[in-house]
Amino acid sequence: MARYFILAVALLLTACSSTSKKPIADDPFYAPVYPEAPPTKIAATGSIYQDSQAASLYSDIRAHKVGDIITIVLKEATQAKKSAGNQIKKGSDMSLDPIYAGGSNVSIGGVPLDLRYKDSMNTKRESDADQSNSLDGSISANVMQVLNNGNLVVRGEKWISINNGDEFIRVTGIVRSQDIKPDNTIDSTRMANARIQYSGTGTFADAQKVGWLSQFFMSDWWPF
């Protein structure tokens, strides 16, 4: 029996020690999309000015087609606070003094026999949770798709290698063309269905993770 118990505990610890797949750079999901431009024929006229390479001074530089680049300004701040508590009290008291049997008191050694029972229970639980996060910065992303209503699906990532680890930012979401500023930037708070991930890999990132044994004690499998 003890052998099966040890085997079950080992399986539970193995399950608790499993971690999600580590992110890698150059993920195909975040790979940029390059627009397919038709080949242009440049006539050799001998002039410095070429019509095929000209750009209007009054054209809109904001992203509007697949393959364009847009800068997302990260301005994220969240704060959550929650508290809960409950208290349960229960008690009972019973006494039978003296005890009668056959019309007379029941006694032992001349001492009247009585019965007393008293029980009480008091359970009190309190919990508090307070969490706040903030993220500031910027990241340039690609326009991956233009929807029928003109909204843009944007996606991009940025990797930074620092000493013994890598830090990365990944962003994906949907933006409105009207919300893009003249300098081709948009606040992250204006993105719909936004997915913003800021994390890292390496020695420093691993040091912040909880060990597998601590995960077991904090999981639902811990009976206490």
UniProtKB/Swiss-Prot annotation:
One of its GO terms (cellular component) is bacterial-type flagellum basal body, distal rod, L ring. A lipid is attached at residue 16 (N-palmitoyl cysteine). It is a lipid-anchor. GO terms for biological process: bacterial-type flagellum-dependent cell motility. It holds the Pfam family FlgH. GO terms for molecular function: cytoskeletal motor activity. Coiled coil: none annotated. Residues 1-15 form the signal peptide. Its main location: membrane. The keyword Membrane applies. InterPro entries: Flag_Lring. Belongs to the FlgH family. The basal body constitutes a major portion of the flagellar organelle and consists of four rings (L,P,S, and M) mounted on a central rod. Assembles around the rod to form the L-ring and probably protects the motor/basal body from shearing forces during rotation. PANTHER family: FLAGELLAR L-RING PROTEIN. This is Flagellar L-ring protein. It comes from Shewanella sp. (strain MR-7). The gene is flgH.
